[in-house]
Amino acid sequence: MTHIGSLLLDAATLMVTGMAVVFLFLTLLVYLVQFMSRVIPQEVPEAAATPKKSQKVQPVTDSVSPQVVAAIAAAVHQHRSATAKQ
């Protein structure tokens, strides 16, 4: 019975030692990060560059050119005639 008791005592000692080491490491890490945030200045975003206006501005047209309409109509007609034969 003393053998099991000494093993449990060793396990508890190892567990407490491990938890203490992890606690100390994390505490040190928190303070180190806080220190670095005070020492190192924050990054300042660069001022947004004003976009240059393009020299060539094409006029916007709401109508579609007749060539495009004819091409679309021909493509639709060809598609319908090809699917009707199947």
From Swiss-Prot:
<keyword id="KW-0812">Transmembrane</keyword>
<comment type="subunit">
    <text>Heterotrimer of an alpha, a beta and a gamma subunit.</text>
</comment>
<comment type="similarity">
    <text>Belongs to the OadG family.</text>
</comment>
<dbReference type="GO" id="GO:0015081">
    <property type="term" value="F:sodium ion transmembrane transporter activity"/>
</dbReference>
<dbReference type="GO" id="GO:0036376">
    <property type="term" value="P:sodium ion export across plasma membrane"/>
</dbReference>
<keyword id="KW-0739">Sodium transport</keyword>
<keyword id="KW-0813">Transport</keyword>
<feature type="transmembrane region" description="Helical">
    <location>
        <begin position="11"/>
        <end position="33"/>
    </location>
</feature>
<dbReference type="InterPro" id="IPR023424">
    <property type="entry name" value="OadG"/>
</dbReference>
<keyword id="KW-1278">Translocase</keyword>
<dbReference type="GO" id="GO:0015451">
    <property type="term" value="F:decarboxylation-driven active transmembrane transporter activity"/>
</dbReference>
<keyword id="KW-1003">Cell membrane</keyword>
<dbReference type="GO" id="GO:0005886">
    <property type="term" value="C:plasma membrane"/>
</dbReference>
<dbReference type="InterPro" id="IPR005899">
    <property type="entry name" value="Na_pump_deCOase"/>
</dbReference>
<keyword id="KW-1133">Transmembrane helix</keyword>
<dbReference type="Pfam" id="PF04277">
    <property type="entry name" value="OAD_gamma"/>
</dbReference>
<comment type="function">
    <text>Catalyzes the decarboxylation of oxaloacetate coupled to Na(+) translocation.</text>
</comment>
<keyword id="KW-0472">Membrane</keyword>
<keyword id="KW-0915">Sodium</keyword>
<protein>
    <recommendedName>
        <fullName>Probable oxaloacetate decarboxylase gamma chain 1</fullName>
        <ecNumber>7.2.4.2</ecNumber>
    </recommendedName>
</protein>
<keyword id="KW-0406">Ion transport</keyword>
<dbReference type="GO" id="GO:0008948">
    <property type="term" value="F:oxaloacetate decarboxylase activity"/>
</dbReference>
